[in-house]
């Protein structure tokens, strides 16, 4: 379990950041997909504040072992909500892969929450192991989506790479796409999976690793 500590803490810190951003940009102009989802819903400000409260609660609770499971459950549910909000958009634009990519962006966070939830179960039950496997392979599927999305929008991905970084924008767009593909293979095969997940965390923090088409 000790190997999970850093990832769990970072997972919570990101959730806290989402909560703060939701509170600061409650006018829905924040550059975050989570906030924009509420754009056309009635009483959307109340929903944004509620989401912010869940992010903050879950992000703080997940920092301590005694409350980590409750925090993971709260975060898993809110991320699942955001993932499901993309389903009608996918149905409306089934030929635009970016919509699927946005779903898997959120579902990757659901998968992370599932892993934390299962890891901090009070006993080593079969149910906990099953939830952990679902989270693990769910995340692996999301990594496949990250790879496919960059393949479809390679030029857009390249545009996010600063021009001054050698050897060039397209080089790094192709390189990160290959990195995602190798990580997916590692996760599904179980070989170097821990290393792959750690490198993925760093890769996902880079602006070159995602492009969104509005």
Locate predicted features:
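Membrane-interface interhelical connector segments
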Residues: 25-40, 152-171
